[in-house]
């Protein structure tokens, strides 16, 4: 098996410019493809997840011109020209869910599938929502999961669409992005969320980006959304993808654990991503954090004892960045509790189980619940732990931080970071020092 040995490191400092946000990149690509006009996207993330979206859009007849991190997309004015396609979407939830919705109203015959793990990630709530407006979608293997067959359908809206919000916010995102393409009698479509909506900041990203493309969604709290029907997205001309706030979390934690000063460029106060909230969680743990509009500085830990304070927090709003807190908790002077993280179980892997298993390898005492994780750090980290990564980019990036505890650590299958951050380990090595 491929592996990478890191550390031991005693400090981390320097400046890192973040790659583009995965969540924003794939949303903007789809919106630009559906819009009227030509859109120039800058700072587009180059990763496995964006490549599968680009490949799919190309297969569907969208004209794309890429040059480095810039992509010029010629919009299709709301309808893909290819009426049959077989689309392989890897393990990219940000591609599978929104594309499924867009294809369901496109009047074609499509197959949507991915890697084996994608076929274990739920999509039933989205399909149920789309069937309410007449979409013809069949499951090829297991009810509620990809692969999917999508067929031409008579789409009509005559009542509010109901969708569950407690498994993944991507189901609601997919509906919101697609419904402007659908006609309705009174010119608007209502979406009602059943249960508590998780990961609300990701819905905020969706609504803000739709607005950049000329479509305004009204919302009543987080339970009711009103979407204009039968309208056209319009290209904003140019749009820049801000840095990936989830990816920022590893470097911000490194700046705390490794003393800093460490500056992350590309996200800050002006970010539309909820995961910048990670900086506040890190501050609660005692890190010295300063934030500008598009940068964040971290300069070590503000306690004389040099350890982070333990944290007990609800991480429903920032589930991806919360993984970094679980590893940072190894460096706290007490027990930390991460609550309301049930969504971890349906991500790239079952992240609660994976995180519990790997934290134990470095000596932590772990209590794992259906939607929580309790981390008690060891007196001393176990050196030379071989960390399994479960084909999950975030597991690999999180556990790189163990090397800042003065012990070497082995990361198995390090190339899995290609999903969102192909050169992560090069960037990390440039900042970490023995």
Swiss-Prot record:
<feature type="binding site">
    <location>
        <position position="199"/>
    </location>
    <ligand>
        <name>3-phosphoshikimate</name>
    </ligand>
</feature>
<keyword id="KW-0057">Aromatic amino acid biosynthesis</keyword>
<protein>
    <recommendedName>
        <fullName>3-phosphoshikimate 1-carboxyvinyltransferase</fullName>
        <ecNumber>2.5.1.19</ecNumber>
    </recommendedName>
</protein>
<dbReference type="GO" id="GO:0005737">
    <property type="term" value="C:cytoplasm"/>
</dbReference>
<dbReference type="InterPro" id="IPR006264">
    <property type="entry name" value="EPSP_synthase"/>
</dbReference>
<feature type="binding site">
    <location>
        <position position="23"/>
    </location>
    <ligand>
        <name>3-phosphoshikimate</name>
    </ligand>
</feature>
<dbReference type="Pfam" id="PF00275">
    <property type="entry name" value="EPSP_synthase"/>
</dbReference>
<dbReference type="GO" id="GO:0008652">
    <property type="term" value="P:amino acid biosynthetic process"/>
</dbReference>
<feature type="binding site">
    <location>
        <position position="394"/>
    </location>
    <ligand>
        <name>phosphoenolpyruvate</name>
    </ligand>
</feature>
<dbReference type="InterPro" id="IPR013792">
    <property type="entry name" value="RNA3'P_cycl/enolpyr_Trfase_a/b"/>
</dbReference>
<feature type="binding site">
    <location>
        <position position="170"/>
    </location>
    <ligand>
        <name>3-phosphoshikimate</name>
    </ligand>
</feature>
<keyword id="KW-0808">Transferase</keyword>
<dbReference type="GO" id="GO:0009423">
    <property type="term" value="P:chorismate biosynthetic process"/>
</dbReference>
<feature type="active site" description="Proton acceptor">
    <location>
        <position position="320"/>
    </location>
</feature>
<keyword id="KW-0028">Amino-acid biosynthesis</keyword>
<feature type="binding site">
    <location>
        <position position="351"/>
    </location>
    <ligand>
        <name>phosphoenolpyruvate</name>
    </ligand>
</feature>
<feature type="binding site">
    <location>
        <position position="27"/>
    </location>
    <ligand>
        <name>3-phosphoshikimate</name>
    </ligand>
</feature>
<feature type="binding site">
    <location>
        <position position="170"/>
    </location>
    <ligand>
        <name>phosphoenolpyruvate</name>
    </ligand>
</feature>
<feature type="binding site">
    <location>
        <position position="22"/>
    </location>
    <ligand>
        <name>phosphoenolpyruvate</name>
    </ligand>
</feature>
<dbReference type="GO" id="GO:0003866">
    <property type="term" value="F:3-phosphoshikimate 1-carboxyvinyltransferase activity"/>
</dbReference>
<comment type="function">
    <text>Catalyzes the transfer of the enolpyruvyl moiety of phosphoenolpyruvate (PEP) to the 5-hydroxyl of shikimate-3-phosphate (S3P) to produce enolpyruvyl shikimate-3-phosphate and inorganic phosphate.</text>
</comment>
<keyword id="KW-0963">Cytoplasm</keyword>
<feature type="binding site">
    <location>
        <position position="169"/>
    </location>
    <ligand>
        <name>3-phosphoshikimate</name>
    </ligand>
</feature>
<dbReference type="InterPro" id="IPR001986">
    <property type="entry name" value="Enolpyruvate_Tfrase_dom"/>
</dbReference>
<feature type="binding site">
    <location>
        <position position="419"/>
    </location>
    <ligand>
        <name>phosphoenolpyruvate</name>
    </ligand>
</feature>
<feature type="binding site">
    <location>
        <position position="168"/>
    </location>
    <ligand>
        <name>3-phosphoshikimate</name>
    </ligand>
</feature>
<dbReference type="GO" id="GO:0009073">
    <property type="term" value="P:aromatic amino acid family biosynthetic process"/>
</dbReference>
<comment type="similarity">
    <text>Belongs to the EPSP synthase family.</text>
</comment>
<comment type="subunit">
    <text>Monomer.</text>
</comment>
<feature type="binding site">
    <location>
        <position position="22"/>
    </location>
    <ligand>
        <name>3-phosphoshikimate</name>
    </ligand>
</feature>
<dbReference type="InterPro" id="IPR023193">
    <property type="entry name" value="EPSP_synthase_CS"/>
</dbReference>
<feature type="binding site">
    <location>
        <position position="121"/>
    </location>
    <ligand>
        <name>phosphoenolpyruvate</name>
    </ligand>
</feature>
<dbReference type="InterPro" id="IPR036968">
    <property type="entry name" value="Enolpyruvate_Tfrase_sf"/>
</dbReference>
<comment type="pathway">
    <text>Metabolic intermediate biosynthesis; chorismate biosynthesis; chorismate from D-erythrose 4-phosphate and phosphoenolpyruvate: step 6/7.</text>
</comment>
<feature type="binding site">
    <location>
        <position position="347"/>
    </location>
    <ligand>
        <name>3-phosphoshikimate</name>
    </ligand>
</feature>
<feature type="binding site">
    <location>
        <position position="93"/>
    </location>
    <ligand>
        <name>phosphoenolpyruvate</name>
    </ligand>
</feature>
<feature type="binding site">
    <location>
        <position position="320"/>
    </location>
    <ligand>
        <name>3-phosphoshikimate</name>
    </ligand>
</feature>
